[in-house]
Amino acid sequence: MATEQTILVGKKPTTNYVIATVMAFNAGVKKVVLKARGAAISKAVSTAVMVRDRFLPGKVQIKDIKLLSDKVQGQGGRERTVAAIEVVLEMA
């Protein structure tokens, strides 16, 4: 049984990530890391808050939030810097 699972947040609806997070905790995972870049950052934050407040109230806490920047290859071969976030959720 894995003690940690990483969920990459992207273009899918927020509820997909909420369900994936809740299913991971129900399967026995102790820590879930939500990772997102760019426009998906707000979706990762919304996912963490929805899991903590609505789906598993009192059972999950936000343990850590890391703000990062990633270098990605943009159009025309130029390197761009994109904001990123990691939200760590743990069972209380």
UniProtKB/Swiss-Prot annotation:
GO terms for biological process: chromosome condensation. Transmembrane segments: none annotated. It is found in: Cytoplasm; Chromosome. Acetylated. Acetylation at Lys-11 decreases DNA-binding affinity. One of its GO terms (cellular component) is cytoplasm. GO terms for molecular function: double-stranded DNA binding; RNA binding. InterPro entries: Alba-like_dom_sf, DNA/RNA-bd_Alba, DNA/RNA-bd_Alba-like. Pfam families: Alba. It comes from the Archaea. The keyword Acetylation applies. Keywords: Acetylation, Chromosome, Cytoplasm, DNA condensation, DNA-binding. SUPFAM superfamilies: AlbA-like (SSF82704). The modification N6-acetyllysine is found at residue 11. Coiled coil: none annotated. Binds double-stranded DNA tightly but without sequence specificity. Involved in DNA compaction. NCBIfam families: DNA-binding protein Alba, PRK04015.1. Belongs to the histone-like Alba family. This is DNA/RNA-binding protein Alba. It comes from Pyrobaculum aerophilum (strain ATCC 51768 / DSM 7523 / JCM 9630 / CIP 104966 / NBRC 100827 / IM2).
